[in-house]
C-alpha cells in the first residue's frame, strides 16, 4: 500500500542485560556483610528467575539489589512478576519471579481500543504478541507513540515501538 506508514508495539527486554544484572546482583550479595551468610542463590532461565535465601528479609534485600541493578542496565521493573515467597527445603525461602515478555491478547485488545478511541485515522492490528499500527500520516503515528508514552503507567508491561516506517 503506497503512502502507508506503520510501527510495531512490542514488549521485550534484552536478555543479556538481564543476565548481567543478575550476575552483578550475585556479586554484590556475596560481598555485602548482611547478606554474605544468607545462602543466596539466583537461578535464571528464559522465562523465570528463582531467588532463594535463608530468610524473607534477605530475600527482600536481594530483590532490592536486583531491581537497582536492573534499572542501572536500563531494564524496566515491569518485566518482573513476583510470585509469593514460599518455603523451600531446610528452612529456606524461595521466590519465583516470572519474566514478562510479549503482549497477551487481552492487553493487546485494550491497547488497540485506546488507540482507536483517540486516533480514528490509524488502524491497530494484533499480530501474535505484538501490535502493528498503520496510518497514512507519520504525524498521526508520532502522536500515537507520544500518547502511549503518556499512558505507560496504566499498562502493566514495558512497551517498545519498533519498525517505524
Curated annotation (Swiss-Prot):
The keyword Nucleotide-binding applies. Nucleotide-binding protein. Gene3D superfamilies: 3.30.70.860, YajQ-like, domain 2. It comes from Chloroflexus aggregans (strain MD-66 / DSM 9485). The lineage of its organism: Bacteria, Bacillati, Chloroflexota, Chloroflexia, Chloroflexales. HAMAP family: YajQ (MF_00632). Belongs to the YajQ family. Pfam families: DUF520 (PF04461). Keywords: Nucleotide-binding. It comes from the Bacteria. This is Nucleotide-binding protein Cagg_1607. GO terms for molecular function: nucleotide binding. The keyword Nucleotide-binding applies. One of its GO terms (cellular component) is cytosol.
